[in-house]
């Protein structure tokens, strides 16, 4: 079992975060003089996607804007989530299309939750020198950083790492990371050139 199956601590397994990743101050933003409320990680994870293409080993699901989304996010859009089984893994790809005429602001993120145990390790593809931002008391990205990678590639999973919630990195050099289980099994995640990693 590689993915977290949900439980008391966290019900999610692998939500798609859109049109924001993280939280806004007071869950509110202003656009063209109007206030909009948008909850943590946006609304896509809580809405039904509809099949666009279905195959034996892959599928594409689509979410289009509707009256409910426009109350929180006044942009017309199409969000496609493509999933495919591969011989050596599983592929997730997301595409966002602005179907309107005005500039559309958004962020998107994958949030797969892998089952791990204390003592497992996360090993980056490349040697890193990176500090991590932590969440502040309002669950917003704080300004303070802490040293995580110093000419190193790996982090041990400990309770202390999660005391302040997520580690948030900007500008990681690696394009992927591997969760190395103590039992020898592993999961590799390729995140390409994602500008932020949490």
Regions found by a protein language model. Give the residues of each.
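Beta-strand elements of well-folded, non-transmembrane domains
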Residues: 65-67, 85-87, 98-100, 112-116
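Residues that act as N-cap/strand-start positions at coil-to-secondary-structure junctions
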Residues: 23, 43-45, 75-77, 108, ...
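Short, well-ordered beta-strand segments enriched in hydrophobic/aromatic residues
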Residues: 1, 83, 90-98
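Short, hydrophobic/aromatic beta-strand segments
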Residues: 102-108
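Active-site/ligand-binding surface loops and adjacent short beta/alpha elements
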Residues: 105, 113-194
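Beta-strand-rich N-terminal accessory domains
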Residues: 1-31, 35-38, 174-195
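Extended, loop-rich substrate-binding clefts of extracytoplasmic carbohydrate-active enzymes
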Residues: 34-87
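Hydrophobic residues positioned within well-ordered beta-strands of beta-sheet architectures
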Residues: 59-61, 79-81, 92, 108-110, ...
